[in-house]
């Protein structure tokens, strides 16, 4: 069987030992593959949300009323959500600086930046827990219905924000783990360890940064779709 030159090259590459991501470390390649797959999941969730919202015949709850907090007796629309967004975007900045100083092998600056990112992420999760508790216990919103309008609001809101909050929580755990590892010098010497088997390499911080920036980017879309639309 004689193959055309293009097909022959394809099969030669497929059968050889060449990696699909030439020159890209396996950890970074695997993270990119994971993020692409996660993008499809979040994309399906947001597409489902748009479909449900545009097809329902019941009035959709107004975000400026549902997510308002009262200060001095006056409700301020979306104030908590604005603070949450600011906290998460700030954490993206500290994460980027942590990657930068990590490659410079400035251990303690990297540690404090990772630790600050973890604290900001934990703060975001805490505020999300407060948001959920307010909706559930004060407003009576449930996954199967709510007293403010369309019954589907609760199910899609808790599903999408809960899935994102789970991602943030996982990221916070790993941020604390790697803060400890950086402080202990596990990335500077040849100390074998979990996710840090290659001594003298801060590549793991960059991989963690890819995940964290993805989580922040997803929140921007959630913020636009759920709170501004």
Regions found by a protein language model. Give the residues of each.
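...captures the hydrophobic TM-helix bundle architecture rather than a specific catalytic motif
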Residues: 1-229
């Amino acid at each position: 069987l004689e193959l055309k030159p293009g097909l022959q090259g394809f099969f030669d590459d497929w059968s050889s030992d060449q990696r699909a991501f030439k020159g890209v470390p396996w950890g970074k390649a695997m993270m990119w593959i994971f993020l692409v797959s996660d993008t499809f999941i979040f994309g399906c969730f947001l597409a489902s949300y748009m479909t449900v919202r545009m097809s329902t015949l019941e009035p959709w709850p107004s975000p400026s009323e549902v997510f308002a907090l009262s200060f001095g007796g006056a409700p301020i629309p979306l104030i908590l959500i604005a603070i949450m967004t600011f906290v998460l975007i700030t954490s993206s900045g500290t994460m980027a600086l942590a990657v930068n100083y990590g490659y410079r092998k400035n251990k303690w600056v990297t540690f404090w930046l990772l630790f600050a990112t973890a604290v900001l992420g934990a703060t975001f999760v805490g505020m999300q827990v407060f948001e959920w508790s307010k909706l559930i216990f004060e407003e009576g919103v449930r996954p199967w219905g709510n007293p403010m309008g369309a019954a589907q609001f609760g199910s899609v809101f808790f599903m999408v924000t809960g899935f994102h909050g789970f991602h943030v929580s996982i990221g916070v755990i790993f941020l604390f783990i790697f803060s400890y590892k950086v402080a202990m010098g596990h990335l500077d010497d040849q100390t074998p360890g979990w996710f840090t088997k290659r001594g003298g390499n801060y590549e793991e911080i960059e991989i963690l940064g890819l995940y964290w920036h993805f989580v922040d980017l997803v929140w921007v879309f959630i913020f636009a779709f759920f709170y501004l639309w």
